[in-house]
Structure formats: structure tokens, C-alpha cells
């Protein structure tokens, strides 16, 4: 089996409870501490086996880390781990997992190889919002429920709000409209992407 580690909880004696996003499900497993075990961390893609035990959760064994081309790039790995960490609270209560999430991460790993990491993640997140039906291309203001036709702001989940309805950073309407339609950040400057990134980190 293969999957991405989206949550790690330490338990007694350096053992871990690990949550893995696989193709069709979220897997929670127990990882015993051992000197010969490979290191694991948030965001790692691993190949693994599960061993059923008398406990409530299976034991994680035969773990092999599947590296990324950029895994030693501090900035890319740091941003990747911050993004991956958001998937656990977002998906933890879902019983049947859509393969979309696994393959979205698979594609993102490849894109990050070639592109600025924050831009790549923001573009991937737009696709996630669209898949979940949460991408508000109607541009109705969250607060006053009137359609936005000029400058706007964005809040958590990239929800659009009239600039006059909030004190948040103002974006050019046409730029955000293009972002939502084309799912590309090439027309946005670095400061705008940085602000989108800060919004994204508030939660998926």
C-alpha cells in the first residue's frame, strides 16, 4: 500500500499513531519505535503494510519512504508539510475517501518540482475547492450576499467578500476571477500569492 502521512501523534515510549491518506481511505495505524525503523514525518509518501492486532488499530510495518526530487529543498518541504497538515482536520470524519485527494497530491508533487511551491499549492487548492463545490465563481459576497463587481477581499476557503465589507487585503476583481477560472497564478505578483498562501493556511 502507498499513501501520504497527514498526521502523527506521539504516544508512550516514542511510539506513534500515524494517519495516512491512501487512494481510497484514511488509514490510522500504530507505529512502534525501533532503532532500525526508517524515519517518518508529516508529508512523507510511504509504501507500507498493515498488520492486524488485538488492538483497535492495525500496526504499521515494512515502511519504505518514497522520496520526492525536492525532499531536501527546505522551503519546498516546509510549505508542503504545512499544506499536508491541513488535510487531517479536513478529512478525518469522512468514511469513504474520494481518490481525488490522493491523485491531487500525486500531481502536486510533480508540479512542485518545476514551479514555485506556494504558487503550485495555491493552484492545486483551487482545484480542490472546485471538486468539493466550494469555489465561488458566482462572486456573491459572503457578508452582504450582493454580487461583487469590483475590488474584493478573500477569507478562509477563498470565499469572496466586497472590499468595503471587510478590512482584509484588497484584490483586483479581474485577477481573482481569472485565478478561479484558469486555476493559474501567473498573473499574480509574489505579494499577492503570499497573501493567498496565508489565507490557505487558515484551513482547507
What are these regions (language model features)?
Residues 1-14, 21-204:
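Non-catalytic alpha-helical scaffolds and adjoining flexible linkers that form interface surfaces
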Amino acid at each position: 500500500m502507498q499513501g501520504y502521512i497527514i498526521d502523527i501523534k506521539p504516544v508512550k515510549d516514542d511510539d506513534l499513531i500515524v494517519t495516512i491518506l491512501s487512494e481510497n481511505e484514511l488509514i490510522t495505524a500504530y507505529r512502534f519505535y525501533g532503532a532500525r525503523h526508517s524515519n517518518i514525518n508529516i508529508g512523507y509518501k510511504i509504501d507500507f503494510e498493515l498488520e492486524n492486532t488485538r488492538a483497535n488499530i492495525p500496526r504499521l510495518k515494512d515502511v519504505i519512504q518514497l522520496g520526492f526530487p525536492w525532499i531536501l529543498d527546505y522551503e519546498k518541504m516546509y510549505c508542503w508539510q504545512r499544506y499536508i497538515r491541513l488535510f487531517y482536520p479536513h478529512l478525518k470524519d469522512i468514511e469513504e475517501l474520494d481518490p481525488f485527494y490522493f491523485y491531487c497530491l500525486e500531481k502536486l508533487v510533480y508540479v512542485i518540482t518545476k514551479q514555485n511551491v506556494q504558487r503550485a499549492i495555491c493552484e492545486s487548492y483551487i482545484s480542490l475547492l472546485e471538486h468539493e463545490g466550494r469555489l465561488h465563481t458566482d462572486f456573491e459576497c459572503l457578508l452582504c450576499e450582493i454580487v461583487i463587481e469590483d475590488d474584493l477581499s478573500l477569507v478562509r476557503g477563498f470565499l469572496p467578500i466586497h472590499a468595503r465589507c471587510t478590512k482584509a487585503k484588497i484584490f483586483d476583481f479581474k485577477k481573482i476571477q481569472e485565478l478561479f477560472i484558469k486555476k493559474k497564478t501567473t498573473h499574480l505578483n509574489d505579494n499577492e500569492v503570499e497573501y493567498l498562501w496565508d489565507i490557505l493556511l487558515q484551513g482547507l
